[in-house]
Design a protein with these regions (language model features):
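A short, conserved structural fragment
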Residues: 56-66
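Winged-helix-like regulatory helical subdomains adjacent to P-loop NTPase cores
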Residues: 1-49, 54, 94-97
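Intrinsic, short, N-terminal disordered tails of RNA polymerase sigma-factor systems
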Residues: 101-102, 106-117
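Residue-level detection of the helix-turn-helix DNA-binding "recognition helix"
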Residues: 53, 57, 81
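Minor-groove-contacting beta-hairpin "wing" of winged helix-turn-helix DNA-binding domains
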Residues: 67-73
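Membrane-inserting effector segments that mediate pore formation, membrane fusion
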Residues: 112-151
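Short, amphipathic alpha-helical interaction segments positioned at domain boundaries
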Residues: 75-106
Length: 151
C-alpha cells in the first residue's frame, strides 16, 4: 500500500484525474453505493492526452478501445477504490456526526433533516397544489406511527 500511496503522491493533479477516470470506467462508475457521472468524465478524458500518453508509456494504463482505458494493476484499482471511499464518505467531524445520531422522537436528527429536505424538494417540484396532499399524508404517517407505539 505504501508503494501505491507514494506513486499517487508523485503524480500531478491531472494524472490523478486521468487515473480516476480510468478506474471509475473500469468499475462502471460505482464504488459501493456511490455513483459518479461517467458520461461527462469519459468525454473529458481526451483533454488529458499528454497524461494518457505518459501513463501508458509508464505501463500504468492500457488502451483497450477508442476512448477506453484500463489500469494494468488490479491491486492498484482496489487501493484507489479504498482511497475514494475515504475521500467521499461523510466529512463531518466527530461531534457533528455524534449529534446527528441522537434520537429526536422517532428518528435521528439526521433522518429528520433528510426527510425535511426531501419534503421541501417535493413541495418545490409539485407546487402549491400538492402541499395540502403532502401535509395530509405526512400527518397521517405521523399519527399512525404514534398510534403504533401507543402514544
Amino acid at each position: 500500500q505504501a508503494h501505491f500511496a507514494d506513486t499517487w503522491n508523485a503524480w500531478s493533479m491531472a494524472e490523478r484525474k486521468v487515473i480516476t477516470i480510468v478506474a471509475l470506467s473500469q468499475i462502471n462508475g460505482m464504488i459501493d453505493v456511490r455513483k459518479f457521472n461517467m458520461q461527462k468524465l469519459v468525454e473529458n478524458v481526451t483533454d488529458y492526452s499528454a497524461e494518457l500518453r505518459s501513463l501508458k508509456e509508464a505501463g500504468t494504463i492500457l488502451k483497450i478501445g477508442d476512448n477506453a482505458w484500463k489500469l494494468t494493476q488490479e491491486a492498484f484499482l482496489w487501493w484507489w477504490a479504498d482511497k475514494v471511499r475515504a475521500i467521499t464518505r461523510e466529512s463531518a467531524d466527530f461531534e457533528q456526526w455524534l449529534c446527528a445520531q441522537e434520537i429526536d422522537g422517532l428518528f435521528t436528527k439526521e433522518e429528520r433533516k433528510e426527510m425535511s429536505d426531501l419534503a421541501q424538494n417535493v413541495r418545490a417540484i409539485l407546487g402549491k397544489g400538492a402541499v395540502t396532499l403532502i401535509e395530509g399524508f405526512a400527518k397521517g404517517i405521523a399519527a399512525g406511527a404514534l398510534k403504533a407505539i401507543g402514544m
